[in-house]
């Protein structure tokens, strides 16, 4: 049966290596200055070449993201800066701006181009247009339903399509947001988003003054035990002022229409339950978001979605335990996004803007060093003798209770204190530990309070 590509994020070479070790078929990484993760991008030209070479040596693919919305100044140096990247031999460029796409088609006509999600492709005519422009794949907008994706697949059957299946969602249409730029002059479309949508805001009632400006009313609004009711009833005729917690006294106006108020913090996408249907549709690539995430995130998401894809291709039923495994990653709550239609409160997290897990915490990375039955672990977070742990490897996972660990001198250690320490754990000598990771299973704790009930 047809098997879609599993495409993982690579914010660093280490993330790339873990993604490949745990089953990714391809990774994507940003070109310096021209992608939307310029603040969190390890990749310079040297690392790009290393990554491309390592991917190809493994029979994998490496895509370079060039999806910035450029102003004129960026055009002056674009071809000069891109030429050495093209010469490295990436498998495709991921692009959104029609002008930059035109320049690449003119100067590097053999270079495959994938249309970025930033281009907002939401219908089959758009996909067909970009096919006629010579692109080889379109990454569809996250705002599409399963039925819309299937119609696009049927209308343009000879064009590759790619779908996001996991990771953060943006409050704006395919990430075309102005909020960060408006509040603190960091333009998301130039790769410097500060995730202002995740911040804590206070909402206070305002009023319209004599000349039509929205001004502060200076009267508190009593709010107690309010449940989200978006999509129910008529929109309010009130206007409101938003105050971000770290910017007291700075107010922005907010309105409500028939869709609700746009505040503002989306849950994370988790579409693993739909991998089987997307596979049957013939979607060519299933993509995981997260170029700013950890190597543990890259490893775990690759492992879980690898199994889901393999099971779907083999005709096996969906393994619901994979949903629980993904709960072990810190997240903002999960949603299926727009793949199936929900009420608005299923999309949004109204309680907090940070990522958290009440199932597991990543606590250590096996270094590869061994002393007999002991293996070295570089500690990342605190754990103790008696804890329930999971040892995760590309070959499979093992849950166990930690009964003993030592320091480098062979002295017993009841506690691995935290980042910067190395401890030695008993591990069978025949167990392969390349890319092995260690997680602590919670019992009433969370990653926000990992050692308190």
Curated annotation (Swiss-Prot):
Q: What happens when the gene is disrupted?
A: Deletion mutant cells display reduced 5-methoxycarbonylmethoxyuridine (mcmo5U) formation in tRNA(Ala1), tRNA(Ser1) and tRNA(Thr4). Reduced 5-carboxymethoxyuridine (cmo5U) formation in tRNA(Val1). Strongly reduced cmo5U formation in tRNA(Leu3) and tRNA(Pro3). Cells lacking both trhP and trhO show complete absence of 5-carboxymethoxyuridine (cmo5U) modification in tRNAs; cells display a temperature-sensitive phenotype and decode codons ending in G (GCG and UCG) less efficiently than the wild-type strain.
Q: What is the effect of changing residue 170 to A?
A: Reduced 5-carboxymethoxyuridine formation in tRNAs
Q: What is its EC number?
A: 3.4.-.-
The enzyme's main class, written as a single word, is hydrolase
A Pfam match: Peptidase_U32
Relate the outcome reported for changing residue 177 to A: Reduced 5-carboxymethoxyuridine formation in tRNAs
Q: Which InterPro entries match?
A: Peptidase_U32, Peptidase_U32_C, RNA/ubiquinone_mod_enzymes
GO process terms (BP): proteolysis; tRNA modification; tRNA wobble uridine modification
Q: Which GO terms describe its molecular function?
A: peptidase activity
Give the top-rank taxon of the lineage listed in the UniProt record for this protein.
Answer: Bacteria
- One GO cellular component term: cytosol
Could you tell me the keywords of this UniProt record? Hydrolase, Protease, tRNA processing
Q: Which family does it belong to?
A: Belongs to the peptidase U32 family.
Chain's role: Involved in prephenate-dependent formation of 5-hydroxyuridine (ho5U) modification at position 34 in tRNAs, the first step in 5-carboxymethoxyuridine (cmo5U) biosynthesis. Involved differently in ho5U formation in each tRNA; tRNA(Leu3) and tRNA(Pro3) are major targets of TrhP.
Q: What is this protein called?
A: tRNA hydroxylation protein P
Naturally occurring in which organism (per UniProt): Escherichia coli (strain K12)
Whichever gene encodes this chain, its name is trhP
